[in-house]
Amino acid sequence: MSLSRRDPLVVGSVVGDVLDPFTRLVSLKVTYGHREVTNGLDLRPSQVLNKPIVEIGGDDFRNFYTLVMVDPDVPSPSNPHQREYLHWLVTDIPATTGNAFGNEVVCYESPRPPSGIHRIVLVLFRQLGRQTVYAPGWRQQFNTREFAEIYNLGLPVAASYFNCQRENGCGGRRT
């Protein structure tokens, strides 16, 4: 289904800052420990130390997906001039499975925002088939849109995000 103006990805400016509008085509379930990520959920760095379990829907295990995890609010939400920071990149994930069955191109690096409340965005793309994806030379100033264009991934088929701030930070994101 197409995203409405009230969709949390639109309200949270994930669509716009990181992604172009897209239609959700498969389910994406992201779990840290026993907490399932819902759009806008607040998580602390201590809760996201280890990579999450990611489950992908779909009905044909011959379809493959690429998962990208980025922070668009680097170094701070008020001055994101290093947008985006790549935290994780997994390719060749078969439908109906999860990240454990994919190819980890860039290993998971847990979010540790230095200041402010950062959005951590997980984006799922459907691949045209198995393909070789090269790790970028650096994690800073990664661009999800350019990455999708280079590897002919098209628009996302699912996405989710959570908010993360310093362990002793306070307050919530204002939208």
From Swiss-Prot:
Its main location: cytoplasm. Pfam families: PBP (PF01161). The keyword Glycoprotein does not apply. Signal peptide: none annotated. It is found in: Cytoplasm. GO terms for biological process: meristem determinacy; positive regulation of flower development. Keywords: Cytoplasm. SUPFAM superfamilies: PEBP-like. It comes from the Eukaryota. The keyword Cell inner membrane does not apply. GO terms for cellular component: cytoplasm. May form complexes with phosphorylated ligands by interfering with kinases and their effectors. PANTHER family: PHOSPHATIDYLETHANOLAMINE-BINDING PROTEIN, PROTEIN FLOWERING LOCUS T-RELATED. Belongs to the phosphatidylethanolamine-binding protein family. This is Protein TWIN SISTER of FT.
